Amino acid sequence: MDTLSNIPVFADAQWCAIATDIAFKVLCSLGAIMLVMCFAGLSVVAERKVCAYIQGRFGPNRTAIPIVAAVPLVGNFLKKNGLMQLVADGLKFLLKEDPLPKHVNKFWYMAAPVIALSPVLIAACVVPFGAYWSDGQLCPLSAADIDVSLVFALAIGSLGVYGALMAGWSSNSKFPYMGAMRASAQVVSYELAMGLSVLPVVMWVARNSDSPLCLFEIARAQQNVWFCLLQPVSAFLFLVALFAETNRLPFDMAESETDLVSGYHTEYGSFKFGLFFVGEYGHMVLGSSLFIVLFLGGWNPLPGVVWPESWGWVGAVMSLLTFIVKIAAMLFFFIWVRWTLPRFRYDQVMRLGWKALVPLALANFVAYLLIMSF
């Protein structure tokens, strides 16, 4: 400390506070990215285990790393629950041959997987994964607390479709191109319904807050009653649109195996295909986080129950754990729906978006507008 105090920059208390704040934000950014990446990886194992349970199978329970498997109790637990399968999948993607077809547009072909994954990691930095008390004020456990974080997360998160679009176009093949067109049309169709579904939430928060578009303010407004109870129609619309935005069954038109082989990533393999895979599950984690903040009370464990200020950093850790449990529950719901419902036809997906969800979202918005006017 004496050495740092001799440096003019750190001798000033103001600069020390700025440096501390920057370091905290960097750590929060890395934490948000690591949280998304870890959940994206674990979702692959969860997908296999839940699928196996639904189909009456055991799922992955044989893969073992020799050194880790030899550890008493821990090794057997990791093996039986298929957690070592995640390492095997990662090594497979890294060590497989990485072909580069001659007929592709090389630059955009290689950039597409990065474009598909990057928006998720950027948008995750504005999500409040918890809260902590500082100088008597409740502060968000996020990398960036901006007044328009809701708009930022929705806008940046939707840019992931450009990765699919670039992959389909640069592959110079009919099936990837058709998958890319489906992905872009689907995002445009359901982004409108998703945006309309959050407007009643914003209007409700605007009554008592100057920053109704801030995710932290939206979550804090649900300390007494969660918005899924106050606005169930909005929650339902957002959830259905979320399935379409993340290309999950029954809305996986962009990579429908029965129609398009593998869709926009048909020409991909090895690590680049793995990035698309992680990007899809990363979008699931981001979408689940937004749904939790908007309708499931954020870091609050139950309606009317909050973590007290006297708990200090213990309360902050508990709020983060609460959020993580809710994300896990949402991911289980995603997987459960995938292995329960059949895939829709493409015309049914478009008809549902434009002829059902958008009119219902408009009617829901007008209804809440009239209710709040009186």
Predicted regions and their residues:
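Selective transmembrane helix interface/packing segments
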Residues: D2-F374
